[in-house]
């Protein structure tokens, strides 16, 4: 190694040693600062006047629960002052030794433990001092609370004394609980003044709760007593009186246990008084509600019968008139059937329907007479009579609907006859008009399809007229033949228009094709075929298709042009 390198090495070692020394001095100073702070915190804790506070509470000569609590906190303070502070002192001394001997890591770890110890001691001392303060203040705190509780109690006593009649059977139990609360106050005073404010506070808590609970009871009882002793019995008496009047007025009831239900309600009132006496207020309130529901149910029964009586009177006044009206209607229906039977073949169901209705009306009349005759001494509840009479009214309404249906069918017979005669005359005229319309077209011949439709329509029209000329007209047969003839006439009219349209358009297209025939052999050939079909087969539709297809090749759209023009000027059949 050269001299230069040796010098550099020595300088480097010197720098490292200086840095190490500086770091060591820094760590040592920092630990010393932390130790001094911990020493100050320890001294502050040690100098707290806890001993004075302990002596002050000890001189109060506590007893009972208060004394037990004091002993626990006092023992905790003794343990702290004798053991915990000594441990901290030893740990501080040990940490200083580590710091002076440059064992900084151990010193730092020891300092951390001391900080934790002091923090725990701070918390324990705070808890001890708070507990001692509570013990010292408990007596005066109790004195303040008891004044408020006494005010509430005296107010409660005053309310009960001034309104004793409102509490009914509950008064004895309320007064008994007032006496119990009074005893609790005496017990509180004894404990609080003899050195056990903690136990006294527990007694005071219970007393306050009992006052609040009894106040709530006192609030609820009057309404329950009024309902049970006055309102419900009054309602029940009114119901009984109303029931007697209804019985005297010959009312009957579906329910056969009404008297027993009255008795059960009175028994329920007596039993519920026991709930009031024992201050079972929830049970008493529930039983009051049940009794009210039963009274309401009985009231509904009576009002139902009263309302039903009015409905029955109204039905008995209107049903005979209604029935008489329906009997008259049935007589008119019978007369209509007899009159129509002279001209028309009516189905047997019409006459049998009217006879059945007559039988039902007679049975309903007997039922109405029976109910009416029993009204002076009714034997059924009006609600039952109401149901029966309303059912009877519904059945009469159904029969009336049947009468209306029969009447409409009978009336329709003559209307159908008149309509068929009018249509027959119209169809005869249409046949003549269509025949003349076709003759004016000067067609080379009439297609067989037209002739078949024409003769079919003519024959069916004749059949319709024959049916109408019968001595006894079968209107169902007339209606059936009329429908056939109507369909035939519609088909004939459509076929007539089609034949004339295709014949006219074919003639126009044949004439128009002359401009192409001289130089277009295909059109010439189509012309010859179409003309042959037109003049010999009389199939004007096929002839039209033949010439139009050829012209469309030479001149697209020409067919539509002719069709559109024709539709604008087409001659209609004037019936």
From Swiss-Prot:
Sum up the protein's function in the record's words. Negative regulator of FtsZ ring formation; modulates the frequency and position of FtsZ ring formation. Inhibits FtsZ ring formation at polar sites. Interacts either with FtsZ or with one of its binding partners to promote depolymerization.
Q: Which NCBIfam families match?
A: PRK04778.1-4
What family is it from? Belongs to the EzrA family.
Q: Does the keyword GTP-binding apply?
A: no
**Alphabetized Pfam families for the sequence:** EzrA
* Stretches in topological domain Cytoplasmic: 28-575
**Subcellular location, record wording:** Cell membrane
Annotated GO biological process: division septum assembly; septin ring assembly
Which InterPro entries would you find in this protein's record?
EzrA
Which residues fall in a coiled-coil region?
105-191, 265-301, 354-416, 456-526
Question: Per its record, how is this protein called by name?
Answer: Septation ring formation regulator EzrA
Indicate the principal place this protein occupies in or around the cell: membrane
Q: List membrane-spanning regions.
A: 9-27
- Topology versus the membrane, per the UniProt entry? Single-pass membrane protein
